[in-house]
């Protein structure tokens, strides 16, 4: 039986970024079904949308809602937009090298966007970001990583998750207990 403060399932951008932003006094376990690099975030070639300035909020919101056929959670979209520059700044601080144009960044206009607000790392944005996040996570003394481990079930009692049942590469099942469990499995898990 293993006990952690936080259990993170998934090693894409969301799982890794979460680990980097949790308190260093928390014991964290990150679990991935393959290797650290074996995820869709690593393969992503597209860019990241960022609010360019305050005047861009409404157009960015409308572009995103329209692209989602207005089925989006508007409050969640607004939060994403409002936090986008802070996230980009954090990624830059972690060493992510976005494409430059002159002294600034090279913003592109793609898909449903009405303005140029997309940042890239050549055509390997996902690989660039994930590689930098992986390197930073590996430096954390409070983080353990289980590769080649599959989530079998969540350990739930009442209305609270207490961890997960994992299967390792050899097929052995083990319970991992945590005060908090974060599912960062992406679109396909």
Task: Tell where the protein language model's regions lie, with residue ranges.
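Structural detector for helix-capping/boundary residues
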Residues: 11, 149, 179-180
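Core beta-strand elements of the Rossmann-like FAD/NAD(P) dinucleotide-binding domain
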Residues: 2-4, 170-180
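Glycine-/small-residue-rich beta->alpha transition segments that form the dinucleotide
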Residues: 178-180, 184-189
């Amino acid at each position: 039986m293993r006990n952690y403060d936080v259990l993170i399932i998934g090693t894409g951008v969301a799982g890794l970024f979460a680990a980097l932003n949790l308190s260093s006094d928390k014991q964290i376990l990150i679990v991935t079904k393959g290797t650290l690099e074996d995820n869709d975030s690593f393969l992503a070639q597209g860019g990241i949308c960022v609010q360019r300035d305050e005047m861009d909020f409404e157009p960015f919101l409308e572009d995103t809602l329209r692209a989602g056929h207005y089925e989006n959670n508007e409050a969640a979209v607004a939060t994403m937009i409002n936090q986008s520059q802070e996230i980009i700044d954090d990624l830059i601080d972690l060493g992510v090298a976005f494409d430059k144009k002159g002294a600034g960044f090279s913003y592109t206009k793609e898909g449903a966007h009405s303005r140029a607000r997309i940042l890239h790392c050549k055509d390997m944005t996902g690989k660039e970001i994930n590689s930098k996040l992986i390197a930073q996570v590996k430096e954390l003394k409070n983080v353990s990583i289980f590769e080649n481990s599959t989530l079998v079930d969540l350990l739930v009692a009442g209305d609270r998750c207490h961890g997960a049942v994992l299967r390792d590469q050899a097929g052995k099942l083990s319970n991992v207990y945590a005060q908090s469990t974060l599912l960062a499995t992406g679109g396909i898990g």
